[in-house]
Structure formats: structure tokens, C-alpha cells
């Protein structure tokens, strides 16, 4: 009787892990407000802005 419940839980866990890995792959570039470094690029259309009193951040430049 317990096998179907266990199977459902395992499948649900696998789907959650797959979904989170997809999101992290999508977020591989720096989105607005994310810290950036010379090795980590910001997303398309964003630039890495060094700040005096903190880490560099990605931001959308004014047109």
C-alpha cells in the first residue's frame, strides 16, 4: 500500500530538482541588482557597475 505514495514522492522530488536546475541555468547571467565580477557577466542589456562602498552590481543603463 505504501509503494504508490513513495513513487509519487520520488517523482515529485525529481520534478522539483529539474525545475530548480532549469531556473539556475536561466539565471547564470547577472540580473539587475545581482553582484557581478570581471569573470561573471551580467545579462544582455545590463552592465556591471563597480561601487565604492560595496560589491559591483548589475544594472540597466539609462538610454
From Swiss-Prot:
Keywords: Disulfide bond, Knottin, Secreted, Signal
Family annotation (InterPro entries): Huwentoxin-1
Cross-referenced Pfam families: Toxin_12 (PF07740)
Alphabetized GO MF terms: ion channel inhibitor activity
CC annotations in GO: extracellular region
Coiled coil ranges: none
S-S bonds: 29-43, 36-48, 42-58
Domain notes: The presence of a 'disulfide through disulfide knot' structurally defines this protein as a knottin.
Identification of the protein by name: Cysteine-rich venom protein 3
Amino acid at each position: 500500500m505504501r509503494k504508490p505514495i513513495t513513487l509519487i514522492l520520488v517523482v515529485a522530488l525529481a520534478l522539483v530538482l529539474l525545475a530548480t536546475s532549469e531556473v539556475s541555468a536561466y539565471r547564470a547571467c547577472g540580473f539587475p541588482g545581482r553582484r557581478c565580477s570581471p569573470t561573471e557577466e551580467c545579462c544582455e542589456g545590463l552592465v556591471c557597475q563597480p561601487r565604492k562602498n560595496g560589491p559591483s552590481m548589475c544594472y540597466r543603463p539609462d538610454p
